Amino acid sequence: MTQQLVKKGQQISLKIKRLGINGEGIGYYKKLIIFVPGALPKEEVTATITNVTPKFAEGTLQSVKKAAKDRVVPPCPVYETCGGCQLQHLAYKAQLDFKKDLLKQALNKFKPANYQNYELRKTIGMDNPWNYRNKAQFQLRQIDGQVEAGLYQADSHQLVPIDNCLVQQPATTKVMNTLVDLLNDFQLPIYDERKNSGIFRTLMVRVGIQTGEVQVVFITQSQKFPQKEKMVRAINEQLPEVVSIMQNVQNKKTSLVMGDDTLHLWGKESIEEHINDVVFDLSPRAFFQLNPEQTEVLYNEGIKALDLQPNETVVDAYCGVGTIGLSLAKQAHQVRGMDTIPAAIDDARFNAKRLGVTNTHYAVGTAEDLLPKWFKEGFKPDAIVVDPPRTGLDRKLLTALLKQPPKKMVYISCNVSTLARDLVQLAKVYQVDYLQSVDMFPQTARCEVVVKLTRK
């Protein structure tokens, strides 16, 4: 049936109704849903069909016959090939409206109890929605004899060289470009995944926005590092802002960028960052939000939603280096946090000690294993804050929360679909007070949401 409606290679005219979760335009052709990246709501476009399935088809934008008033010219020269951003062609105010609408779409799909009456607050955006990312993680490739660093084109392993990413902090761009020049100067062997040869796979550069400290991580196929001393000396001479040089070994066939072994090459083993007057040490593998300016906004919204009293205890699930929990520690009687990465827990403990915070307890493990264990031991928290990965809450953790729900909960989500799915369960024991979206990643389709929940 679908094959008769539309064929691969066919050119069709479409009216775009809305944007999908990846920022792509959505239209209907003879009742078949068509996804067209780059198209905007209220536009009339021509698209060429590239993929057909029984339930939907995908197309590439050929021309815009009637443009939306919110369409703007993307300032990035590689915007259409890079795949890192999805919304540069949409005016920023409209991006904020879209992110609130995404949340509405997800709730409509999963229909948690009473969802039509949820309070959805306006998305909090940035004054300057550019140059916000504190970390660049660029793949390396030898192209025509030259080392290039960049990102893979969407759904491919085709590298798009990038020497000025408009959403990156300028400090990371400067360091990245200098490192690429040095790799070329020293003619170091770049990893080739087809031949499984070479050494240098990826460069990671992270900057502490408040401190100006920069960390460089060379991600390599093996522990080998030809001309290591020369490279370190050159970085010292040309990039005095770099205070930490590390090497991470990733020799497995996996989509994970980093491996388990991290080697210290020079300087400090971590860099400092400040959020809400709390100082954090960031080691190479430690998770830390990519937009520190909006992270402060996000966590302040979380703190406000929790409304902790001095006698209350709180669990910081998925705690990372302790960013949320340490921001809460002043207001709470005790904070307990957990994370699966031992280095992150080490950082969280160190951060607490350095700040003189004595009312925290950090443990290595999953929230779904540790929370039931703590419940059995008699620790019954008054509040819990969860900041899970994009996959949402683990089923075992949800079960534990449904059995013994703390009286207050804040859910910080980076994926509106898994949030809406989890709210179906959480709404059985919690009232959803409000949802506050925060734009952590301007120019992309991603959005963070703070949800305030109170036990029924």
From Swiss-Prot:
The record ties this protein, via SUPFAM superfamilies, to:
Nucleic acid-binding proteins, S-adenosyl-L-methionine-dependent methyltransferases
Please provide, alphabetically and separated by semicolons, the GO molecular function terms listed in this UniProt record: 4 iron, 4 sulfur cluster binding; metal ion binding; rRNA (uridine-C5-)-methyltransferase activity
Residue span(s) of domain TRAM? 5-63
Q: Which domain of life is it from?
A: Bacteria
Q: InterPro entries in the record, alphabetically?
A: MeTrfase_TrmA_AS, NA-bd_OB-fold, SAM-dependent_MTases_sf, TRAM_dom, U5_MeTrfase_fam
EC number(s) per entry: 2.1.1.-
Question: According to its UniProt record, which residues of this chain constitute the active site?
Answer: 414
Q: Which residues form the signal peptide?
A: none
Residue sites binding [4Fe-4S] cluster per the record: 76, 82, 85, 165
Q: Which UniProt keywords apply?
A: 4Fe-4S, Iron, Iron-sulfur, Metal-binding, Methyltransferase, S-adenosyl-L-methionine, Transferase
**Which parts of the sequence bind S-adenosyl-L-methionine?**
289, 318, 339, 387
Q: What is the main EC category here?
A: transferase
Q: Which GO terms describe its biological process?
A: rRNA base methylation
PANTHER family, A to Z: PTHR11061:SF45, RNA M5U METHYLTRANSFERASE (PTHR11061)
Q: Which family does it belong to?
A: Belongs to the class I-like SAM-binding methyltransferase superfamily. RNA M5U methyltransferase family.
* Name of the protein: Uncharacterized RNA methyltransferase EF_2706
Species of provenance: Enterococcus faecalis (strain ATCC 700802 / V583)
What is the taxonomic lineage of the source species?
Bacteria, Bacillati, Bacillota, Bacilli, Lactobacillales
